[in-house]
């Protein structure tokens, strides 16, 4: 079972509803603004339709944070838009969980959004069924790495369209960003999966932006002491660099004033 499936909590389940989440409509506007930066003349009607359909399909579902579930696919779509992907991929990102977690079918998607979007969502749904966990801790490192490599190859082979992998990476990235709401055991399992499967795939595809953030978030849960030590060192270097730049600017300004 994947962490995505565990995230779906229905309205009648006992959860503490968070009061500190972003309004879905505000997230949607952020998505549209992001898309229009690189596709200013693009017709957004299909994206708007996908948002309405996904909102209705997920309306009684919540994440473990207490947020409405629609927050997740919207964030996935924003990550994809930040990578400047095409409109069909953005739409599939918004709809990527509706077949697995709601009553909607692939046929429904094909009828409403066309073959391209339906095939992308179907590809993501199939990837989510690959069992990524379950390695025996007593096996050698070489054996575990071979198993991880086999999983990576299976993952890539099953995705007939590279955009399916992009959606899955965006899906995993947002789940990693919100991993604090999972149990400690789930945090370790998901972070390990991310480190062993998703980070190498992102590296192979040359998506350094996602790879780096996935690595950082994995380290945060697998080796928290090392992670926070690194964060502290980076912050210290930034402060030193900022002080140097500010001093340099002040020197230049003073020289200009003296020369003027």
Can you describe what each PLM-predicted range is?
Residues 1-260:
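Active-site helical microenvironments for divalent-metal-assisted chemistry
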